[in-house]
UniProtKB/Swiss-Prot annotation:
This is UPF0488 protein C8orf33 homolog. Residues 55-101 are annotated as: Disordered. Residues 70-79 have a biased composition (Basic residues). InterPro entries: DUF4615. The keyword Nucleus does not apply. The keyword Acetylation applies. It comes from the Eukaryota. It comes from Pongo abelii. The modification Omega-N-methylarginine is found at residue 27. Keywords: Acetylation, Methylation, Phosphoprotein. Belongs to the UPF0488 family. The modification Phosphoserine is found at residue 82.
Length: 229
């Protein structure tokens, strides 16, 4: 009896054909456990070995590459914009400021403005026909502008009240005069004549025959008379 019990225990220990349920359970345990456990191993294309949970976290290879390219493009555009802004700021810093005029230049400019205003008033008196009141006002303004006792703010106020923006008017008049001078200088230049024009206006000078010259010289000195008979 002891020997039969020992043989039965060895048969139960070794798996054989008589235990199909155990082998099926052993085979099905792998897929069931992998489906139930989210941390089972899978292979993602283009990526190292990872779990299913990690595969949800990172995108696929192509999507990740496009996202990284977009980020790089955004960074490049930002860098270019910052460089451009920096260049504009540097150019603004390097731009020279307007140099104020010296005392001598200011005095000369004021003299030119006063002379222009006085000239305009005198031309208005000559060309126009002002009434006595306007004539008196113009003469008084000329005296005020030419007076050395009148303060400078008073002169500028008077010029502004009479002519408005007199500096802009002076600039426009100066440009017009410069344009007229350029036109006169251009018209005064000797321009070459075309060959066709020279051929049309060309004159042929030929010497006179000798016999005609002698005939005019050998005329007698007799008085000319009409011979009707």
């Amino acid at each position: 009896m002891a020997a039969l019990g020992h043989l039965a225990g060895e048969a139960a220990a070794v798996p054989g054909l008589g235990t199909p349920c155990a082998s099926r359970r052993h085979r099905l345990s792998g897929p069931v456990s992998s489906a139930g456990n989210p941390s089972t191993v899978c292979l993602c294309p283009g990526q190292p070995t990872c779990s299913n949970a990690d595969s949800r976290a990172h995108p696929l290879g192509d999507e990740g590459g496009t996202a990284s390219k977009k980020q790089n493009k955004k960074k490049k555009t930002r860098n270019r914009a910052s460089v451009a802004n920096g260049g504009e700021k540097a150019s603004e810093k390097l731009a020279p400021e307007e140099v104020p005029l010296s005392a001598e230049a200011q005095t000369q400019q004021l003299a030119q403005e006063l002379a222009w205003c006085v000239e305009q008033l005198e031309l208005g008196l000559k060309r126009q026909k002002p009434n006595p009141k306007q004539k008196e006002q113009a003469i008084g303004a000329i005296r005020t502008l030419r007076s050395k006792r009148t303060p400078l703010p008073r002169k500028r106020q008077l010029m502004h009240s009479l002519f408005g923006d007199y500096r802009a008017q002076m600039e426009a008049e100066w440009r017009e005069a410069l344009r007229a001078l350029r036109a006169a200088a251009y018209s005064a230049q000797v321009q070459p004549v075309d060959g066709a024009t020279r051929k049309k206006s060309q004159r042929v000078c030929r010497p006179r025959p000798i016999w005609r010259a002698k005939a005019t010289l050998d005329l007698p000195d007799e008085e000319f008379k009409f011979n009707f008979f």
